[in-house]
Amino acid sequence: EAMIGRIIVDPSESFLAGSVEDEIIFKSYQQFKKPNEGLRIGLLASNQNLYSNRRIIEAAEQRGHEIEFYNIRQCFMKLDATTPQIHYRGGKAIELLDAVIPRIRPAQTFYACALLRLFESLGVFCLNNSDSIIQSRDKLFSLQLLLKQGVQIPTTGFASSPLDTNDLIKMVGGSPLIVKLLEGTQGKGVVLAETKKAAESVINAFKSLNANILVQEFIKEADGKDLRCFVIDGKVVAAMQRTAPPGEFRANVHLGGTTSIIRATAEERKLAIKATKAMGLRVAGVDIIRSAYGPLVLEVNSSPGLEGIEGATQKDIAQMMIKAIEKQCNYAPKGV
């Protein structure tokens, strides 16, 4: 009768089963759902709308995978001997993931890496593992690891007491010099001290706040430029040059630096790969500066942004990251 218009069926008024929870509906229709033939990937990050995260989600879906975004702050864990689990706010335990892509802000390193360790113990492949991320985030430790593997860096000084300030300045060749906060990111907390007096003032000011700092030689011949080499699975897949805006020495894109495509030399590519391996990372953005005595590594970034490098090179870096996961998981996509 309803089919020919004689009876009106209003689900909100006439639904005999009453209100049905989403979980019951999901179970009822699960048998009719076409099984997903791709991998199940989790993107562990903070902001789904950032360019890098949107591109990763897009690339995974284009290659036939199911990808879920998990906000780091909304994950919580259960630790026990039999059924350790990671839960997501408002839902059940996160299960059956093949891989996790971590995109971690420095301020969330501690908690996010705790989540990653549990994923790793549950047999989930993490594109960058927790240990590698932790050591790459420690500026002093990462420089020590680089030197241990024979990777060249700018001459760097570190001291605990303000009483050693003068010796620290001499150690790196005097002024001008760079003062870096160990906790700084994206060029923040980096100061160029052009005179010895300015260097003393900056160092002592940071020390009075109990801040940990590094002092580094200033590479004048770099002329406000550096290279970002993007490394995936032991290969430099793209490289760009970053140029600081007028009146600035920092070339970070977040501070107004511009990007352009550049061909890294064989020596620079080798250095970037070596630096990435020293950190134990599969995916990294390696920042290199050209000096009078050869290329030097400034930093190894475990969550490198994609917007600058994809824009400068027109390469699909996000898809390369997904392919690296497929390779590790022995997955061969169909029709892609």
Label each residue range with its predicted role.
Residues 2-29:
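C-terminal capping/lid region of NAD(P)-dependent oxidoreductase domains
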Residues 7, 41-42, 177:
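Conserved hydrophobic helix-helix packing surfaces used for dimerization/oligomerization
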Residues 29-127, 132, 141:
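ATP-binding N-terminal substructure of ATP-dependent carboxylate-amine bond-forming enzymes
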Residues 188-279:
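Phosphate-binding site of ATP-dependent enzymes
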Residues 61, 65-72, 116-189:
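A conserved helix-loop-beta module that forms one wall/lid of the active-site cleft
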Residues 9, 101-102, 216:
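Redox-cofactor binding/interface segments in oxidoreductases and associated redox assembly factors
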Residues 30-36, 263, 277, 290-336:
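C-terminal active-site "lid" helix and adjoining low-complexity regulatory extension at the edge
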Residues 10, 44-46, 232:
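Short hydrophobic segments within beta-strands
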